[in-house]
Amino acid sequence: MLCQNCNINEATIHLYTSVNGQKKQIDLCQNCYQIMKSGGQEALFGAGNASNGNSDEPFNPFNDIFSALQGQDFNGAASNQTPPTQTGGRGPRGPQNPRAKQPKGMLEEFGINITESARRGEIDPVIGRDEEIKRVIEILNRRTKNNPVLIGEPGVGKTAVVEGLAQKIVDGDVPQKLQNKEVIRLDVVSLVQGTGIRGQFEERMQKLMDEIRKRNDVIMFIDEIHEIVGAGSAGDGNMDAGNILKPALARGELQLVGATTLNEYRIIEKDAALERRMQPVKVDEPSVDETITILRGIQARYEDYHHVKYTDEAIEAAAHLSNRYIQDRFLPDKAIDLLDESGSKKNLTLKFVDPEDINRRIADAESKKNEATKAEDFEKAAHFRDQISKLRELQKQEVTDEDMPVITEKDIEQIVEQKTQIPVGDLKEKEQTQLINLADDLKAHVIGQDEAVDKISKAIRRSRVGLGKPNRPIGSFLFVGPTGVGKTELAKQLAKELFGSSESMIRFDMSEYMEKHSVAKLIGAPPGYVGYEEAGQLTERVRRNPYSLILLDEIEKAHPDVMHMFLQILEDGRLTDAQGRTVSFKDSLIIMTSNAGTGKVEASVGFGAAREGRTKSVLGQLGDFFSPEFMNRFDGIIEFSALSKENLLKIVDLMLDEVNEQIGRNDIHLSVTQAAKEKLVDLGYNPAMGARPLRRIIQENIEDSIADFYIEHPEYKQLVADLIDDKIVISNQTQETAETTDEEVPAE
């Protein structure tokens, strides 16, 4: 098969494309393909087809391929990139298509006129940015290097400064040199789009700059200006937008306003030649009071859009609550989001129909009614007549100020609760009862540790009514005491009371963080290490669920760097992860458990001087494991006392309830006599080991016996455990009752 271009060499390259739904195949030799790749269609025709005379052929096979590559139909209207050799092009060889439109200017095609939007009143009022706007005007008024770049965190109002500049130009409140200027926002993505062939992007940029020079009234605004570095460069020697703009920016031929974040501005700073042509203008995050002023300025716009009313308390709550509880965002953006979302939510309850929509539906029904009348389909005509009358009734309904929904502080609080899962509203009746009874509910499950329960309950109550310290966690406690006395159990029950499940907490076993290199897992690996892109195990979970309970089990086993990390968390309620994000712990409850020092102190049971001496001894032993600055940052160091036999009797009841819950799936119920319970306590009592031996005793004497009895007698569902001959025996409850009755009759 010969090359379709030169008809001399063997075709070794086959190109496939789809044009207007039809598959096309082009067969080329290596030489013709290289010519086409480097020089485009004109070079290919000049080199290969000159001898064949095929360059003017109206249906040349290459036309479709180049039309497809350039995003146009060969027979349709050609863009300004169409080579003059193609039929239908702008050259003398191709007749003009009568349907072809006159091409728009590059600025109209790839830009949005912000000044025109300001004239039409389509932009929101810009409030509290007078200093930044004044600084931008001063830079634009310079002779050279008059290109301000607004830098600041996302959502602080950088684009609003440019809109404020456009509004001042419309109002005439600018120097004479800036009068009648047009601020046009350039879309860099659209500018790059469709420039896959080498040289197309440079040509488009050159035409854009020529147009700006001719007009001499354009201030070009590029949002995310760091995109111009590398834009249009395909890696094969093409120049990017930044390099093309450099000469014009230096001489003042082109006035450019940019906006980007602090992190992304570093991309521009890497190109020193480009960076020196720009003048940075820092846009800081507004304060809460300034945010309230901004919200009041745009309040009317959101009220008109959502057909609602905002109270002054709602405006203030949006600023204060967003600043307090929404951590990853910046003012005023996150406060405006609360206004917008609360308005959207309230608007859903409003029975309001757009008048323009009603008019359109009435006109449509009128035309259909007339068509039905002409077709003598009177039943259908009557249907449309009734529909028109209903629409006219709707048209008369108007939403008055009395009917308009009002957004209050409670509505804003509900939005914050939905976003963060943090309860910030007024105490509901159920929650109020829960907080009142919190200590009693915890004491019912955590036996013998009343002091620890009371301190935890008071800390949560303080935080819930707004008396907590603003920059510290809800509470931070170190639980110390011998093993098996309920330190971890108290944390589980607290999570169950607050979040509904004992597993709803962020729990870390500190034995996993004994090595120095493993500490980085909490906040993420540092740059240059494996796992840098992965989030920290602690910081990411707290960032997603700020209202949470964090349990660090056996803290004395952790590497000292973990405690150094928590110094800042316990004091300031914040920590920066490996990605540079600041994570707030202000709404978290931090509990650490430890049995450090208890091994050196003899366990004792009871009250009085002996216990007081033991307490002092344990706290003295803690200094051997923890530094003073670490222990000094806790809200409380709570010692858990050893359990007495009376405590164990109550714990036995709780453990037996768990056994009944497990066997209840098989419709079995177990009753245990008081004598059997006391026997279980005698077998499992060990002050040094706490309640854990009791669980093993119940497993050996109760659970194993139940399993044996049920396998032999599956028909019995009501079981009883009793002490017979100093042994715990499982039997059928009916049988046990009968035997007891027989023994009592002779005694009478």
From Swiss-Prot:
Residues 80-99 have a biased composition (Low complexity). InterPro entries: AAA+_ATPase, ATPase_AAA_core, Clp_ATPase_C, ClpA/B, ClpA/B_CS1, ClpA/B_CS2, ClpA/ClpB_AAA_lid, ClpA_ClpB. Keywords: ATP-binding, Chaperone, Metal-binding, Nucleotide-binding, Repeat, Stress response, Zinc, Zinc-finger. A zinc finger (C4-type) spans 3-32. One of its GO terms (molecular function) is zinc ion binding. Disulfide bonds: none annotated. Residues 107-354 are annotated as: I. It comes from the Bacteria. Induction: By heat shock. GO terms for biological process: cellular response to heat. PANTHER family: ATP-DEPENDENT CLP PROTEASE (PTHR11638), ATP-DEPENDENT CLP PROTEASE, ATP-BINDING SUBUNIT CLPC (PTHR11638:SF175). This is ATP-dependent Clp protease ATP-binding subunit ClpE. It comes from Lactococcus lactis subsp. cremoris (strain MG1363).
